[in-house]
Amino acid sequence: MSWQAYVDEHLMCEIDGHHLTAAAILGHDGSVWAQSSSFPQFKSEEITNIMNDFNEPGSLAPTGLYLGSTKYMVIQGEPGAVIRGKKGSGGVTVKKTNQALIFGIYEEPMTPGQCNMVVERLGDYLIEQGM
């Protein structure tokens, strides 16, 4: 299965009638493996800062998580594994695998829990596959 198919079929899928706003799979170096057409244009330092937070959990909390120049308030995640951000009625979930970062961005009516489930389920599967 292509990386784009993972984005299209496993991240941008329908959950209780709702979809993520945007999704992507990136390498740890910030290279885009696949993304939805709606995924924001990001800066390389934004991905570097996200990777730094996985290595030093809590480092993003004071400044916030920036993605595509949008600032998300960092909320409870799983240190070294999942970073979650909130902005207004939406947010972002980032799951780190051995080689990739899985991103899901949502807006209401999708819930944070639905976004977490979609992103983390794919991330856990890729980890099981050695990715």
From Swiss-Prot:
Motif Involved in PIP2 interaction: positions: 81-97
Main localisation: cytoplasm
Pfam families, A to Z: Profilin (PF00235)
KW Phosphoprotein (keyword) present: yes
Disulfide bridge map: 13-115
Annotated compartments: Cytoplasm, Cytoskeleton
Keywords from the named record: Actin-binding, Allergen, Cytoplasm, Cytoskeleton, Disulfide bond, Phosphoprotein
Matching CDD domains: PROF
Superkingdom: Eukaryota
InterPro entries referenced in this protein's UniProt entry, alphabetically: PFN (IPR048278), PFN_euk (IPR005455), PFN_sf (IPR036140), Profilin_CS (IPR027310)
GO cellular component terms given for this protein: cell cortex; cytoskeleton
GO molecular function, one term: actin monomer binding
Phosphothreonine modification, residue list: 111
Stored PANTHER family: PROFILIN, PROFILIN-2
Function recorded in the entry: Binds to actin and affects the structure of the cytoskeleton. At high concentrations, profilin prevents the polymerization of actin, whereas it enhances it at low concentrations.
Subunit structure: Occurs in many kinds of cells as a complex with monomeric actin in a 1:1 ratio.
Similarity comment text for this entry: Belongs to the profilin family.
Protein known as: Profilin
Organism: Phoenix dactylifera
